[in-house]
From Swiss-Prot:
GO-annotated molecular function: mRNA binding; rRNA binding; structural constituent of ribosome
Species name: Aeromonas salmonicida (strain A449)
UniProt family annotation: Belongs to the universal ribosomal protein uS3 family.
Gene name of this polypeptide: rpsC
GO biological process, any: translation
Name of the protein in its database record: Small ribosomal subunit protein uS3
Length: 236
C-alpha cells in the first residue's frame, strides 16, 4: 500500500521553517527539547479556547522567546494584558530562564490547517454531521483563495459499528511537489462513540525562492495595514 510522508517534515528547510529555532551543545540539547515540549503542552492546554494555530520558540542568550500564532489575540492578551503576563511568568518558571511572549494574529483562519482541523473536531463533538462539517471547511477555504484542500475523517462516523475513513477533496493538492506550500494538520474529536481523527491538507500555491521567500511573505502579512487616504475634500 502507498504511504504518505509527513508533508511538513519533508519540506523543512525548503518551504517550511522549524517551529523551534535554537542551537545547543550535546549536554543541553535534551533539556531544551523537553522544556520546549512542556511549554507547548502548557500553552495548548491554557489556550484551548483561543483558536491556537502554532507556537514557535527561540532561545536568544539564556532566555526564551515564545511566539503564539492565534486567530483570537484578544483572548490570549486578556484585559490590559493580564493574561499574557500570567503566561509569561508560567513559561519562565517552566524553563528556568527569563521569558518573552509575542502574539501573532492569523488573518485568515479558514486557510490555516490546524484551525480548520480544530473547527471540524469541535463540530463533530457538537454532533454535527461529518459530511456537512467537511464540506463547510472545504467551501470556506476555496472561497478565500486556497488552490486546493483535502479533508479526511476516520473512526466510528455517525456512530456506526464499524470504523471507516471518508475524505473530500477540491482543487489540487500536489504532495510530491516540494515547492508546493502545503499546510498539513491533524486533530482528534472525542465523541460518545469514541475518537474520530481529522486530517487536513491545504494547498496555498507554489513557493518560488525557497525559505527566504516564505519568511518575507510572512513578515509582510504580519505588518500592520496602512490607513487609506481620504482624497475627498473636506467641507467647512
Amino acid at each position: 500500500m502507498g504511504q504518505k510522508v509527513h508533508p511538513n517534515g519533508i519540506r523543512l528547510g525548503i518551504t517550511k521553517p522549524w517551529n523551534s529555532t535554537w542551537f545547543a551543545n550535546t549536554k543541553d540539547f535534551a533539556d531544551n527539547l523537553y522544556s520546549d515540549f512542556q511549554v507547548r503542552q502548557f500553552l495548548t492546554k491554557e489556550l484551548k479556547n483561543a483558536s491556537l494555530s502554532k507556537i514557535t520558540i527561540e532561545r536568544p542568550a539564556k532566555s526564551i522567546r515564545v511566539t503564539i500564532h492565534t486567530a483570537r489575540p484578544g483572548v490570549v492578551i486578556g484585559k490590559k494584558g493580564e493574561d499574557v503576563e500570567k503566561l509569561r511568568k508560567a513559561v519562565a518558571v517552566i524553563t528556568g530562564v527569563p521569558a518573552q511572549i509575542n502574539i501573532s494574529e492569523v488573518r485568515k483562519p479558514e486557510l490555516d490547517g490546524k484551525l480548520v482541523a480544530d473547527s471540524i473536531t469541535s463540530q463533530l463533538e457538537r454532533r454535527v454531521m461529518f459530511r456537512r462539517a467537511m464540506k463547510r471547511a472545504v467551501q470556506n477555504a476555496m472561497r478565500l483563495g486556497a488552490k486546493g484542500i483535502k479533508v479526511e475523517v476516520s473512526g466510528r462516523l455517525g456512530g456506526a459499528e464499524i470504523a471507516r475513513t471518508e475524505w473530500y477533496r477540491e482543487g489540487r493538492v500536489p504532495l510530491h511537489t516540494l515547492r508546493a506550500d502545503i499546510d498539513y494538520a491533524t486533530s482528534e474529536a472525542h465523541t460518545t462513540y469514541g475518537v474520530i481523527g481529522v486530517k487536513v491538507w491545504i494547498f496555498k500555491g507554489e513557493v518560488l525562492g525557497g525559505l527566504a521567500a516564505v519568511n518575507a511573505a510572512a513578515a509582510q502579512e504580519q505588518a500592520p495595514a496602512k490607513p487609506k487616504r481620504d482624497n475627498k475634500r473636506r467641507g467647512k
